[in-house]
Every structure is written in C-alpha cells, then in structure tokens.
Amino acid sequence: MKRLSTPYQIMMVIAMGFAVFYPTLYAEICLVDDYDAISYFFSQDTFSLKEIFFPQSAGGGYYRPLIGLSYLLDKQLWFLHERLMHFESVVAHTLNVLLVFYVCREAVNLHLKRRETWLPLAAALLFALHPIATESVNWISGRTDIMMGTFVLVSVLCLLRFIQGRSKILLAFAILSALTACLAKEAAFGYLIGLPLFALYRVDTVSTVENQGYFAWLRLFLVYYLCAFFVALLFGSYWLVLGIALVYLAHISYNKFDIENISVSAGRIVKYSGVLISVFAVSAGLFILLRRLAFTSSVSKIGQTFTLMLADINYTISLFLGAVGFYVKKFFIPLPLNFFILEIDPLYDFVGIAVLLLFCHLILSKKLPAIFSLLGLLLLLPALPFAFGTIAWTAYAERYIYLSSAFWIIAVCLWGGDWLGRNPARKRLVTMMVVIVCLFASGITFKRNIVWQNNVTLMRDTVTQTPQIRKLRNIYIKALLDKGMTDEAVKHYQLAATSLPSLAGDEQAALMVSGKLIVKGSNNEALQLYQDALLSTHFKSEPLLIATIKLLQAMQSVGTVPEQERKRLEGLSNKYSSLLDEIDHNK
C-alpha cells in the first residue's frame, strides 16, 4: 500500500466503489418520494429558476432549492431517465469519496507532520464501501445528503489548505461552499456551527487522556458514566445527567489547563472565532430570509415539533441522547439496515450518555481528530428533532449520518496514525484489519444494493423489519401489483386489513387491489374486498362507494347472470347509491 502512487490509489477507490454500487445502476424508481418527484417534474411544461428558489407556496417544508435544480437539469439533459439518475448518484458518491481522500491527506500532513500515503486510501475505501451510504446513493430523493456532502467536504479541504498558510481566498471559498451546502440540506448548519473549531486548532496540544494517562482517564470516565447511568435508570432525570456531564467537563478542564502550556495567541483565537461565528450568524439569517421569501407560510409539522420539544424538555433530552447513541452505534455496527425506522430501543439512551461524556473530552481538545469527530456529531444536530416522528416520513434514517460517517472515518484514521506513530510494528496488523473490514463492508453494501434494485424486495425487507406500520404495507402492496403479483398483494392486503389499524384515506389500497382483481376477471372477489373496505370505513368513503357501484353495474350487465343474482346486485347498487347521495348532500 505504501508504494502505491496516488493515481493508482484513486483508480482503486473508483473501481471498488463502482463495483460495489454497480447494482444501483439498474435500480427502479423508488415508490417512496422518487416516483412523485419525477412525476411532478415531468408534468411541468415550463419551469424557471425563480419557481425553484422562490416558489411562493404556502405550507413550505424543506427549503432545498439545489435539489429542485438537479431535477430540472435531469429533465433537460436526459428526460429524468432513472438509470442515468442512479448513475449520477453513484458518480456523486464517488466524487465525495475522492474528496474524503484529499481531505484526509491534507489532515494527515497537518496533524502527523509525516507522509502516510495509506491512511487517505483507507479513509476513502472505508467511506466508499460503508453500508450506511446505500440509502443515500440508491434513493434518488436521498441525493440531498450527497449534494450537501460535496459542498461541505470542499469547504473542509479549502479550510485545511488555508490553515497551512495558503491563500486567504481559500477561506472565502470555504465559507461560500458551506453556505451553498445549506441550500442542499439544512443539516449543513451543523457544519457551520462547528467552523470555529478550526480556528482553535493547535498542533502542539496535549490531550486530556495523554495528560492523565489512559487508565486514570478511563477510571474517571467510568465513575462519571456510572453516576449518570444510574441517575437515568433509577430516576429518569436527564436534567441531572446533563448536570453530571457539566461537572465532568469542569473536572477534566481543571486537570487539562492546570498543566497545559497554552502557546497559541488568545487574540488569534478570538479573531478567527469571531469571524466564523459572524459568518454562521449571517448565513443563518440569510437562510431564514430566503426561506421567508420562498414560502408564504411554513408547514404546521415544524411548529408542532418545536411545541413537543418544549412541552417536556426532560423527555426531549432523553430522545436526543438515544438518537445520538443509535447513530453512533450505526456507524460502527450498521446492521440491521432498514429503510423505515420509527422507534429505537430505549437502551440507546445509555450509549448516548457515553457519547455525551466523550463529547466533553473532544470539546477541550484542539487536535484535528477531535475536531473531525465533533463536526460529525454537529452534523447530526439538525436531524435530532426528526426523532419525534412529526416532520419526515420516518423518525430515524441511515442517510442522516452519511456525511457524519465521512468525518468520523477521517478522525479514526488520524487517531490510528497517532497510535501507529508510537507502535510502528503494528502497521501490518492494522493494514490487515482495514482490508478485512473493507471486504466485509463491500459484501454487505453490495447485498443491500441488490435489495434496493427492486421495489418489491426493498419494501418486503422494510415490512419484515417494521410489520406494524400500515402505510408500509400499502406501499408494498402497490409494488406487488406493479409486478403483476396480484395474489400475493391480496394476501398482504387482507393481512393488513385484519391486523393493522386503518388509516384515514386508506381506501387507496383497496382500490388498487380490487382494480387488479377486476382486470383478472375476479369480480366477486373484488366486490367482497370492496364491501369489507366499506365496512371498515363505516360506508363513508366516497371513492370506495363510486368504485363499488361501477363494479355492481358492470356485473349486472353481464348477460349470463341469473335473475336472482341480478336483483341482489341491483339492490346493493341502490343501497350504495343512496349512501353516496347522502354523503353528497352533507357536503
């Protein structure tokens, strides 16, 4: 690995990335969001940049104009062809992988002060093959994370080169790229919050762990963790958990700064921090202004979420800690992969507490690995309110740590470089471990990409892991019907209708399944399904009544129907017509 030149390393990364994501090129349009988005842009005869950046619509949700712009370009270039759009996603992910390679190379040169050509290659391969990337790459609507990642990684690359004393134009370009990332996805504001961390970077700093010794640090960490653990377990007070974390931060701060020789000018720190904090404040203000110009009002779900957050702050802290613990675990142990995650195990709260205490160490460190770790955590912040399940279609999602994983991988590689500097004899062992991890990751990722190729396999996997959600069943039923698997669709519809609660407007599944049965000539089966669905809706569904009446009239017109059966069908038709008239009268 050490002798492999940069061009060969890049070719290896690209080749492995495309080999693993090759199945993505033949994936269908996902029934969740992708189909609706593509249909919407297909239906628009004309579209202007003003409509994308300033639509002036009411009930605005996400403000991500760059995504709309990408769909517009797809329409102009290749008529929104799904294979080419999937190819775009794979290429964009590969671009991010190359950016991780160059960012890690700059970080290694800056942090280790020596050339370690294999560390950037390891970082790029781990990011390229990490199973957590599959959702963002395969789901066309998930391109938001990839686009945001490109601009954020370009910003980091420019900042690292600026820190090494290169042109100040790089700083301006880094800020501009970070602002552009916010137009792809709001999570980029987490990166903007962390920008001042680069101003605090110091090469000669000594970490708290190194000051105290590893065993002394671990002992202190465990004491505070156990205190927080039992407070959360026995009393459920997460306010006290935060208090313990603050005491822990004060404790290690005293130990750190009591012996540390601060060699960097405080004026320089204040100067650059002030500049970057001002940039964040201005960019946040500009984003809010753009959003208000784009939408006449915001979707009610956003307000509902903030109301829930403030209603019980102790619960909010618990929910956020659990989410952080869940995502950090997903980075190290991504399995099982799931497209729809509504809730997580409450035990992740305790993982989140450990991450919170580690955060205290990271925030005091001015080393580059700590900065990258913190940036990965900060990129998670905007996704935490989604855990309430009121904004997005799923409360938790693997794609939320797509970019965080890049920062954490770089941090792990930098720490690994530190450790190998003290233990050079272990380099061969570490190299073998990286190769093994990459092989396992590539196998998992390739297999997951095959699942994503087909709506039936994707939704079957999702329903298997989350069987209690009715809307997932309905999407699965549609996928089955689109593939002509009517019998299996009927089976799953009947299972959902009898075992899962009905949703408002849930008649769509009944209409889809019955429509396919009618095409097959199974009119009696379709009629029975309509009647069961009408009963579950208390005969209040207008679309179901209309469809049932049409079916009854068609069945009456068949010449071979016995007279007695014809009268029965006519009676049902009259009954449902009366119910429909009653609904129209009450409108």
What do the predicted segments below correspond to?
Residues L249, T457-K587:
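C-terminal luminal/periplasmic domains and tails of membrane-associated envelope-modifying transferases
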Residues M1-E488, Q494-M512:
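Polytopic membrane enzymes that build or remodel cell-surface glycoconjugates and lipids
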